[in-house]
A protein has these predicted regions:
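Conserved SAM/AdoMet-binding glycine-rich loop
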Residues: 101-288, 293
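Short, aromatic/basic amphipathic alpha-helical patches
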Residues: 11-19, 126-132, 308, 335-344
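Glycine-rich beta-alpha loop elements in corrinoid/cobalamin-binding modules
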Residues: 1-63
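A structural motif corresponding to the C-terminal lobe/cap of the Radical SAM core domain
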Residues: 237, 249-417
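Canonical Radical SAM [4Fe-4S] cluster-binding loop centered on the CxxxCxxC motif
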Residues: 59-100, 105-107, 119
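C-terminal non-catalytic accessory extensions
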Residues: 416-479
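Short, solvent-exposed loop/turn segments at secondary-structure junctions
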Residues: 5-9, 27-31, 71-74, 82-86, ...
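Structural alpha-beta junctions
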Residues: 16-25, 132-144, 280-286, 310-320
Length: 479
């Protein structure tokens, strides 16, 4: 059987490629797969043991994953939720799933909720009360469970032996690392070697259980867990249009961190700003949002949204982290197999410029006007200049921009032999082009292809400008 997000959005394409007719949508009614089974699969507890089957450690590996609602009351053109979860569900029980998880896998520190529009629920107050009662009220803390005991219990129950054999080896390595007595380390290593339990691919359940009496005291000796703050994260964000003082005061009863408020387009600015002020007034000062771009927005509107967040941080004493997120049509046959979509107000050069800036900010923009203005410009004019700027000049701003070095001299104290002012040189030539030549230059720059043969231009002034775009990262780093 094939199902899930891709199969629901691209059902015809999946069937054509595989010959399998996919299941579209949620498994949220009894008998979806087995007519004689009354279980609602979508509401069953998750199997967290699969996280132990691989070497990669997920950043949110110590969180409960859940939905308390499904669907969304909106029908935004850019969003896949109406197709994935077409019917809004006001409430899904959380408490029973957490109790099952705690018993089988041990308690998790955080609660990561994937609801698409929780504020639309008629059961909103009940949902927040349940989250609080499950141990996530304001000020709630978490004491890590005994991972060794969980591992042994699950092996004895024959629950996912593959996962818990790997977990056992991981725990053994931790114990060796934490033991301070070299003789104890050596003795443990030799015992593990003798039992073939140094590596998961040679270890067996039988040998791990046989070592229990010896290993357990060492685990207890080396593991002294301390309490840690718990957090709740409505990871998909909440709808700014539905925020009120009442529902923010209610949300402030749990350890929400961060509060993610959608800011999908500039037309929402008044509603969005009001929602931020209400949240901060309710005591919620750690906020975040995704900023959709490359849809129907103009580039300058992305700057306005980013700037508004930075200004609100300064005024309200809040922390708002913004994550620009490029729109891509996932169910358009022309684009779902590539990343080539360009919005009607955008071009390939602008997209690359945003990505280059975000690489330097690690994909997010937080508080701090000086850092923001260095990355995105002091005003929308500087922002547009950065979008047209050669990519290497964006990435190595300190090397190529003398004006920036002078303006931020308190931070840029190191002088290198490579420092120059090619940015000003490029900009003067760029601005000096006649309107007709500038349009021609922009039409070439917009395609973001500058190798020999990528474009045809015989105008010397335009070619002088385009020469700066041929300077590569390798050129900079090799010099």
């Amino acid at each position: 059987m094939v199902g899930g997000i891709m199969s629901s959005l691209l059902a015809d394409e999946v069937e054509a490629a595989t010959g399998i007719k996919p299941f579209v949508g949620l498994l949220n009614t009894p008998g979806d797969i087995d007519p004689d089974n009354d279980f609602i699969i979508d509401e069953l507890p998750l199997d967290y043991s699969i996280l132990e089957e691989i070497d990669y450690v997920y950043p949110a590996n110590n969180a409960y994953f859940a939905y308390m609602t499904r669907g969304c009351v909106n029908n935004c053109k850019f969003c896949a939720v109406p197709k994935l979860e077409p019917k809004y569900c006001d409430y899904i029980n959380l408490k029973q799933r957490i109790e099952h998880t705690d018993k089988r896998f041990g308690a998790r520190k955080d609660l990561l909720l994937l609801d698409n529009n929780v504020l639309a629920s008629k059961c909103y107050n009940q949902i927040i009360d349940e989250i609080r009662d499950c141990g996530f009220g304001i000020g709630a803390t978490y004491s890590p469970p005994n991972e060794y005991e969980i591992m042994i219990d699950n092996l004895r129950d024959s629950y996912n032996d593959r996962a818990y054999i790997r977990k056992a080896i991981s725990i053994y390595k931790e114990i060796i690392k934490k033991l301070k007595d070299e003789d104890e380390k050596t003795e443990l290593y030799l015992k593990l070697e003798e039992a073939h339990c140094l590596y998961y691919y040679t270890a067996s359940k039988k040998d791990i259980l046989a070592l229990d009496e010896y290993i357990r005291p060492l685990y207890d000796k080396t593991h002294k867990p301390s309490k840690r703050k718990r957090i709740v994260d409505f990871n998909q964000g909440i709808d700014s249009r539905l925020i009120t003082e009442a529902n923010m005061d209610k949300l402030a009863e749990v350890n929400i961190y961060p509060l993610r408020i959608a800011f999908d387009h500039w037309n929402l600015r008044d509603t969005y700003e009001k929602s931020i002020r209400i949240a901060v007034k309710s005591g919620i000062k750690n906020l975040s949002n995704y900023l959709l771009y490359n849809f129907e927005d103009k580039p300058e509107e992305l700057y306005f949204r980013l700037r508004l967040n930075v200004d609100l941080c300064e005024e309200l004493g809040a922390s708002i982290y913004s994550f620009p997120m490029k729109y891509h049509p996932i169910n358009d046959k022309e684009f779902f197999m590539n990343r080539d979509y360009i919005g009607k107000h955008w071009n390939r050069k602008f997209i690359r410029a945003i990505q280059a800036v975000l690489n330097s900010t690690k994909g997010k923009i937080g508080r701090g006007i000086e850092f923001f203005e260095e990355a995105f410009g002091r005003d929308v004019g500087e922002f547009m200049k950065i979008l047209w700027m050669p990519e290497t000049f964006i990435i190595y701003r300190r090397i190529y921009d003398a004006n920036l070095r002078a303006r931020l001299a308190n931070r840029y104290t190191t002088v290198t032999k490579h420092d120059c002012d090619l940015t000003s040189e490029w900009w003067e030539k760029f601005k000096a082009l006649t309107s007709e030549k500038l349009e021609k230059a922009k039409s070439i720059i917009a395609l973001n292809k500058f190798k020999d043969g990528d474009y045809l231009c015989e105008d010397k002034e335009i070619n002088d400008v385009l020469a700066y775009y041929k300077i590569t990262r390798d050129d900079t780093e090799s010099n």
